[in-house]
Amino acid sequence: MPQKNAQDRLWKILTPVLLVLAVLAMAKTLFVGLEIDEEYAFSLGFRLVKGDRLFYTMWEPHQLSALPAALVLALYTAIAGTTTGALLFVRAVVLVCKAAMSAVFYRDFKQTIGRHGALLSAVVLFVYTPKWFLGPDYISQQFHFTVAAFLCFYHYYTHGFRRPWLVVLGAVCVCFSFLAFPQSALAAAVIFIGMVLLGRRGKEPTICKIPRGAVLFVLGCMACAAAFLAYVLPGMGLTVFLQRVSLILNDPQYDFTTSQRLALLASQALNTAKFLAKPLAASVVLCLLWWAKTRQKRDWIGLALNLWAILAALLCVVRAVADSSSDERYFMPALVLAAAWAFRKGRGTVREPLFWLGFLPGMAAYAFILRSTLLGFSATFMYLTWPALCGCFAMLARRQMEPEQEKLPQGQCVLAALLVFLLVCRFWCVLVTGWKPANVATANLKQITAGPAAGTWADEKAANMQMALYEALEPFAGKQVLQAIGEQHGLGFMMAGGTLTIGQASVISGTDSDPRFIQYYEELPEKRPDVILYDEAEVRDMAAFHAWIEENFTITARYPVTHGTAHLQVLVVD
């Protein structure tokens, strides 16, 4: 009892401290930093707001993630009548949604994993975003809609199969997750199997001898698919739709085979293994010394795995500070292995729904994402965060249900190490264009005073570019714009108060001259631009596309726009 009272007193102090730190960290993220991936998410949504159509006039590889961003941007433009300041608004909406999700998590899990564990977990969920920014890009949507779907399913299966509408709502959320990253749709099969097993073991009411939740899940997904096709197909037809899908799937950036992808991953895995070997060795040595001293009978493998994850996470904290990089997630494989171990002997316990509805679908999604993404091996670890967190919840649940077997708060310690990593990266690192290392001490931050990013602070290069885009495009209200630039500036399309339209096949960054750019204007002549932008500091090979532009468009005027380090060239088209 005295020990419990001491823990309660400690948590009375820790609770407000954690909440204040989390709020301050996310407030910094709300106002500071800008990266082109976040801009890309905004420009996708803006295309829908301005009347572009999925697959028909949008040839984007990630266009299926455009719907949520479009809804929020449409709301803002309807209220404000402009896109000025839209970045802050959308970030704030995402932040409010994250806070609500964390609150729901705490409410539903405080009995299962304890109040303190639920609080720590909720704070981690609030502070975490896959790419650190708050903009609703496709990776962030895949994570957050997955969590939202899980919360719906988990409540239904752990509260006596009441409120079946939650399964339908969860199906809608999971469909948005699949739209954001279609390769993760394999998780649907795992979720269905889990629902059938959980339903039969829990004596759930059935429909046609199939557990009700599984049936509602399938019907909900089918309804979403039908609604999506009803939205996309009118005016285009199935034949054109399939042609567009084939065209987009043949994106030159993704032109690699499974064997080529596996070979690349294998070559990169060695560096991760070298990094993880040190904390693993330290964990094994510490556990052996502990065992030699106490000779206790306990789960030494689980303890070693958890200690490995903790040490690896703390080592990543040191690297993040030293390198000023928030991309130090090498600890995640260790955390996933510790998570997998936490689910052993979980059948019939409160851990079972966590396994079937959270951990296993997350691992299935990761397997297919790993094959299809362009990211390097260590960068893909962000997709392991959700299954890893489910394992942490399982550790907390086991200790809550079996306090005599699990006296050490291992789950809390693992989550605490993860939270330290997240908070250090949030406070110390600054997002800059190109994911280059930067921190609050060295980044030359400037306030952006005009355009959709008005009111935020970014590194000097990004801030200057936003102001140059504003100055270059302000005279062209209502015109159609083409950025013939390899590194696209998505917020540039939202200049001139949101009156511009987008006149190009794709707004994704990182592409060299692509023959589909030319095909786009041949098939859709109405998308020919009125104004074209070049970047004098072009980092991609756009020579072929620029040559085609000069030959096929009548350029009536050409002039430079410079703002600090940003140098644009404006071409006016007849």
What are these regions (language model features)?
Residues T158, A187-A225, T258-S259, L289-R295:
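Perimembrane helix-loop-helix junctions
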Residues E60, A188, F427-S509, D530-R540, ...:
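Short periplasmic/luminal acceptor-recognition loop of GT-C membrane glycosyltransferases, typified by
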Residues C152-F176, I207-L219, A304-N306, L354-L360:
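Short hydrophobic alpha-helices at membrane interfaces in multi-pass membrane enzymes
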Residues Q111-R115, V147-V167, A340-R351:
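Membrane-interface transmembrane helices that cradle and orient dolichyl/undecaprenyl
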Residues P130, W165-P182, A188-I193, A223, ...:
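Membrane-interface alpha helices of multi-pass inner-membrane proteins
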Residues L134-F143:
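Short acidic/glycine- and proline-prone juxtamembrane loop motifs at membrane-interface regions
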Residues F42-L48, T57-T82, S177:
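Short hydrophobic/aromatic helix or loop-helix immediately within or flanking a transmembrane segment
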Residues A100-V127:
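Transmembrane-helix signature of polytopic, membrane-embedded enzymes
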